[in-house]
Protein backbone atom coordinates (compact mmCIF):
# COMPACT_ATOMS: atom_id res chain seq x y z
CA UNK A 1 0.00 0.00 0.00
CA UNK A 2 2.80 2.40 0.87
CA UNK A 3 4.56 1.69 -2.42
CA UNK A 4 1.39 2.44 -4.38
CA UNK A 5 0.99 5.81 -2.65
CA UNK A 6 4.64 6.70 -3.25
CA UNK A 7 4.31 5.73 -6.90
CA UNK A 8 1.17 7.87 -7.34
CA UNK A 9 2.78 10.87 -5.64
CA UNK A 10 5.88 10.48 -7.82
CA UNK A 11 3.77 10.37 -10.98
CA UNK A 12 1.86 13.46 -9.90
CA UNK A 13 5.07 15.37 -9.25
CA UNK A 14 6.50 14.39 -12.62
CA UNK A 15 3.33 15.53 -14.42
CA UNK A 16 3.37 18.86 -12.56
CA UNK A 17 7.04 19.45 -13.38
CA UNK A 18 6.56 18.67 -17.07
CA UNK A 19 3.54 20.97 -17.24
CA UNK A 20 5.46 23.77 -15.54
CA UNK A 21 8.40 23.53 -17.96
CA UNK A 22 6.08 23.53 -20.98
CA UNK A 23 4.44 26.75 -19.76
CA UNK A 24 7.80 28.42 -19.12
CA UNK A 25 9.10 27.40 -22.55
CA UNK A 26 5.98 28.73 -24.28
CA UNK A 27 6.38 32.12 -22.62
CA UNK A 28 9.96 32.65 -23.76
CA UNK A 29 9.25 32.91 -27.50
CA UNK A 30 7.89 36.29 -28.54
CA UNK A 31 7.09 37.77 -31.91
CA UNK A 32 9.73 40.45 -32.41
CA UNK A 33 10.03 41.39 -36.13
CA UNK A 34 13.61 42.68 -35.94
CA UNK A 35 15.08 44.15 -39.14
CA UNK A 36 18.40 45.73 -40.02
CA UNK A 37 20.63 46.42 -43.02
CA UNK A 38 24.07 44.84 -43.31
CA UNK A 39 26.81 44.93 -45.95
CA UNK A 40 27.26 42.09 -48.40
CA UNK A 41 24.85 39.88 -50.29
CA UNK A 42 22.60 37.00 -49.33
CA UNK A 43 23.60 33.60 -50.54
CA UNK A 44 20.55 31.43 -50.93
CA UNK A 45 21.49 28.74 -48.45
CA UNK A 46 21.33 28.07 -44.72
CA UNK A 47 24.49 30.12 -44.11
CA UNK A 48 22.75 33.35 -45.16
CA UNK A 49 20.01 32.81 -42.58
CA UNK A 50 22.55 31.91 -39.92
CA UNK A 51 24.63 35.00 -40.74
CA UNK A 52 21.52 37.18 -40.44
CA UNK A 53 20.65 35.59 -37.13
CA UNK A 54 24.15 36.29 -35.78
CA UNK A 55 24.25 39.88 -37.10
CA UNK A 56 20.86 40.77 -35.65
CA UNK A 57 21.75 39.13 -32.33
CA UNK A 58 24.77 41.46 -32.06
CA UNK A 59 22.68 44.58 -32.74
CA UNK A 60 19.60 43.75 -30.67
CA UNK A 61 20.83 42.39 -27.34
CA UNK A 62 19.51 40.70 -25.18
CA UNK A 63 17.05 39.30 -27.76
CA UNK A 64 18.03 36.01 -29.37
CA UNK A 65 16.48 35.93 -32.85
CA UNK A 66 14.89 32.89 -34.47
CA UNK A 67 13.31 32.28 -37.89
CA UNK A 68 15.51 34.76 -39.76
CA UNK A 69 15.61 35.48 -43.47
CA UNK A 70 17.73 37.56 -45.83
CA UNK A 71 17.02 39.73 -48.89
CA UNK A 72 19.64 41.31 -51.15
CA UNK A 73 19.15 44.87 -52.40
CA UNK A 74 21.40 47.52 -54.01
CA UNK A 75 23.29 48.71 -50.93
CA UNK A 76 23.62 45.37 -49.12
CA UNK A 77 21.26 42.91 -47.50
CA UNK A 78 18.22 43.22 -45.26
CA UNK A 79 18.00 40.73 -42.45
CA UNK A 80 14.77 40.19 -40.59
CA UNK A 81 13.76 37.80 -37.84
CA UNK A 82 10.20 36.93 -36.83
CA UNK A 83 10.61 35.41 -33.37
CA UNK A 84 12.94 36.02 -30.46
CA UNK A 85 13.85 34.47 -27.16
CA UNK A 86 13.67 37.20 -24.54
UniProtKB/Swiss-Prot annotation:
S-S bridge residues: 32-84, 42-70, 52-79, 68-81
Signal peptide segment: 1-26
InterPro entries assigned: SCRL (IPR010682)
Transmembrane segments annotated in the record for this chain: none
Highest taxon of the lineage: Eukaryota
Compartments, record wording: Secreted
Keywords: Disulfide bond, Secreted, Self-incompatibility, Signal
Gene Ontology biological process terms in this record: rejection of self pollen; signal transduction
Similarity comment text for this entry: Belongs to the DEFL family.
Function: Involved in male-mediated self-incompatibility.
Family matches, as PANTHER family: DEFENSIN-LIKE PROTEIN 226-RELATED, DEFENSIN-LIKE PROTEIN 245-RELATED
Full protein name: Defensin-like SRCA-homolog protein
Organism of this sequence: Arabidopsis lyrata
Lineage: Eukaryota, Viridiplantae, Streptophyta, Embryophyta, Tracheophyta
Amino acid sequence: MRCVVLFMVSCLLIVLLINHFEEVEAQKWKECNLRDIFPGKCEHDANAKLRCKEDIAKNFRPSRPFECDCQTFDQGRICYCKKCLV
